[in-house]
Amino acid sequence: MISAQQLTKRFGAQLAVDHLSFEIPGGQIVGFLGPNGAGKSTTLKMLTGMIEPTEGTATICGLDLLRDTLEVKRRIGFVPESGAVFESLTGLEYLEMVGALYGIPEAAARERIRQFIAFFELSFETLTDKLLGAYSKGMRRKVVITAALLHNPPVVFFDEPLDGLDANAAVGFKALIQTLAREGKTIVYSSHILDVVERVCDRVIIIDKGKLIADGRPDQLVAERNAGTLERLFTELTGGAELQQRAENFAKTFRP
């Protein structure tokens, strides 16, 4: 479903993504991990057609990302970390606009919206009576997730999808993406909540300084380095262990 070949992005003299190559088949949930500034968001923006790579290429569902950008966008869903929406619209107006942009018949779009309203336990009155700018962070997140899945895309990218969701909504969301994967959809899941990634993802890709540094099943990668947990493996590979030690030493200065 996703094939990246030597994907590279430069911003002036800064090399943000350094010749990344990987293949992701259908039906797989892949945790896309890295510390802040590693190039995760830049890579996701390239794969979703928001920015063009400086070098390299990628295909989504067999379509060339650069040559067939519009068709690629029709086949993907994307939940960005920022969760940007049109704040001057109600939730229902926004979702109906998204449905129209994807060419979904009005009745079909309204039915899909109702299904997501039920799944996320949203209030239909809230979707119709309040502007998105007045929504809570969690409510807005649910609307953005609904918009990303409304056209039933075969490939979905999530960037920090649990941000703002309460515990019950987060549990439901994790069950949702596992169901989507069983239906053959490709899920790319970027998050800093590593215990969730370890439980939900079939595979993790870890990048640092724009380069791929690990790729495999979470349990296998953890076992190979005798790390115990994915979080510990991540800190060892990305220099977080040194930061953790500095934090522990700093905390000791407060002890009587």
PLM region descriptions:
Residues 2, 9-189, 194-200, 204-208, ...:
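ABC transporter nucleotide-binding domains
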Residues 219-256:
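ABC ATPase nucleotide-binding domains
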